[in-house]
A protein has these predicted regions:
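Active-site rim helix/loop that mediates acceptor-substrate recognition in acyltransferases
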Residues: 10-27
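Conserved beta-hairpin
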Residues: 26-40
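Conserved beta-strand in the GNAT
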Residues: 36-46, 52-53
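Conserved acetyl-CoA binding element of GNAT-fold acetyltransferases
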Residues: 49-61, 91
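Conserved acetyl-CoA-binding loop-helix of GNAT-fold acetyltransferases
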Residues: 64-80, 101, 105
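Conserved GNAT acetyl-CoA-binding A-motif
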Residues: 81-92
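Conserved catalytic-core motifs of GNAT/GCN5-like acyltransferases
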Residues: 91, 109-125
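Conserved active-site alpha-helix within GNAT-family acetyltransferase domains
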Residues: 95-112
């Protein structure tokens, strides 16, 4: 998550790049690979008994075809590995169009907007809440 090509895209103005990153207890991580090649990481945070939040960190070299191939595997992996999961949600700042398109292609529906709730480059942005429920599939 601290990769120099990823961290600037997922951090707000008040989150400087840490010297190191330590996995948090209670989180579930899924390394996205193509053979031995690391493409990125999915981080899942349990929000309550049935909802998990996903954070997607795909390296620039993997964006496009490889990322979408991995995306097709995500729902089945999540339902099999995230205990009690009935819904997966994510929050995407409105300026991050590629992340929004990626979430929508994952089959996520737009649930709503949290207005002016993310500070990036000195500007406030809306945050879009999206999610997918068990039984729904990638588009």
């Amino acid at each position: 998550m601290t990769h120099p090509d990823i961290y600037p895209q997922i951090s707000d103005d008040e989150s400087p790049l840490p010297d190191y990153w330590q996995a948090s207890e209670g989180h579930t991580y899924c390394l996205v690979t193509d053979g031995d090649e690391v493409l990125g990481l999915w981080a899942f945070i349990k929000k309550n008994a049935v909802v998990w939040e996903i954070h997607t960190c795909i390296l620039p070299k993997a964006r496009g075809r490889k990322a979408y191939e991995a995306l097709k595997l995500l729902p089945a992996w999540a339902w099999a590995n995230l205990k009690g999961a009935r819904r997966i949600v994510t929050e995407v700042p409105d300026y991050n169009r590629p992340a929004l398109v990626f979430a929508l292609k994952a089959g996520m529906d737009k649930y709503g907007v949290n207005p002016k709730s993310y500070l990036k480059d000195g500007e406030l942005h809306d945050v879009i809440l999206l999610g997918i429920s068990r039984g729904e599939q990638c588009h």
